[in-house]
Amino acid sequence: MFERLEAVEERYEKLNQLLMDPEVINDPKKLRDYSKEQSDLSETVQTYREYKSVRKQLDEAKAMLEEKLDPEMREMVKEEIDELEQKEEELVNKLKILLLPKDPNDEKNVIMEIRAAAGGEEAALFAGDLYRMYTRYAESQGWKTEVIEASPTGLGGYKEIIFTIIGKGAYSKLKYENGAHRVQRVPETESGGRIHTSTATVACLPEMEEIEVEINEKDIRVDTFASSGPGGQSVNTTMSAVRLTHIPTGIVVTCQDEKSQIKNKEKAMKVLRARIYDKYQQEARAEYDQTRKQAVGTGDRSERIRTYNFPQNRVTDHRIGLTIQKLDQVLDGNLDEIIEALILDDQSKKLEQANNEL
């Protein structure tokens, strides 16, 4: 591990020199690439330097114990050693996590798709609750949201809603939301007070750039039509709505949120790129999991990942066994406690796997 850390620090210093090179300064692409690489390495290098400082202090403190000290001073040195050893252990654990392979998509924007599943109108209302939960969470992080396509119902729910979340690191936090979300509550229309169970599915995809996903224009069929509102009524007499069909994969994307056909096509292409990338990633993951004989984890959208129980004001994430009695706060966008627990669990599993492969 420490050989890798030395190599990382050496590369960091090299990048510092390169970023002062006039040739690099005058080359926007190199400047951007080197700056990003330096930024990515910065936390690891600073933590490693802190570790080396603590290690040096620890060696000096232990050397002091070899000298003749009065009892009071010896006790003070022992206390300092205990504190430094605890700090050293914390820094080593942090460095192990920092050296784990990074998800190349973590810094990307997100395309999120929420669909009502089992439960009829109740499922559609729950899909609306989830949409509001994620938009409020995005606001708390300083991110922007933009609707791409929506199929609202008469009571304020959604059969389906697709939207982007724009902000640095959005995917790193929201990628754990993939899967089936279950709600348990008494519908307003239920006179007997019985609890109903409904579900909605969430797909969280990283937004991909054109250069990252090659799509041959010959493989896309473009259909245009007049956009429609709730209930199917026409709201636009121009052919502004766009449907894109990727013939090789059969993936279909529709967008009619904008008045302009050009803007609708741009939005639809963003979703299409993300879905094609996700399809290939899922196929690669499935092959990898089959090889390692592992069960499909959080990427399996048919898996029930979380339950929202209204009568008990309870949220349970079934993947990590986390239960919190703050449903009202969670639906208001306070997702930090759940997301941080999921990130920690993911890091722990990766650390265990890395240790097993040593």
Swiss-Prot record:
Q: Name one Pfam family in it.
A: RF-1
State if Manganese is listed as a keyword.
no
Q: What is its main location?
A: cytoplasm
Give the UniProt subcellular location, in the record's own words.
Cytoplasm
SMART domains from the UniProt entry: PCRF
- Positions of post-translational N5-methylglutamine modification: 233
Q: Which family does it belong to?
A: Belongs to the prokaryotic/mitochondrial release factor family.
Designated name of the protein? Peptide chain release factor 1
Organism source for this protein? Geobacillus sp. (strain WCH70)
